[in-house]
Amino acid sequence: MNIIGLGQAGCNIAECFKQYSQYKVIKIDTGLEKAKGVYALEHQDKPEDYENKFPNLKRALLKGVNGQTLLITSCGFVSGASLHLLEQLKNKCQISVLYIKPDGSSLSKEKSLQDNLIFNVMQEYARSGVLERLYIVDNVKLSDIVGDTPVREYYNKINELISSTLHMINVFENSKAVMNTFSKPIDVARISTLGLVDYETEEEKMFFGLDMPREKRYYYAIPEDVL
């Protein structure tokens, strides 16, 4: 599976996937050091400039990228390139997007507008079938889940929570279950979130508050000696 981080938040989460051998990680942002799987964009002053000046990466960074691909991004200015990047990927991959919803109370007016734009467009892409799935996670809810954390470790904890949860879902999806009651997923229900559930109390901690979810899937990891 390919993991593409776009912008600072996306790249930081993508970096967490490097600890797992199942993923090919690509990072796209400004100020990145030259390395394999990395593309450093030129700094632009406006989000639309990142879209208008986004390079063609099909023959370089994206060469050989096909199959299941997850694009991770948020509302930073570099996210202005996300639609152009999806255009370059759409005929090569089965694309899903993980969108990190920021704390709206701390956003500037310009970033708030960018958040609304990208968030709404991604939802339309999911509903129209351009995306296999749109995962939405909310920084405010994630903050509540990780609890009291030293400032220096705050975003590291959140990024690790997101990446490890997604990784475990991929592991479950590609492992034979001892028992399952899954039905075929609803094809038109492509906007999703992630969450954790306490096995004993059944308390659910969702990463984003979806309006009227149409389907839920629960994965239980039970030690073999208990089975």
Residue ranges and their predicted role:
Residues 1-227:
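Tubulin/FtsZ superfamily GTPase core signature
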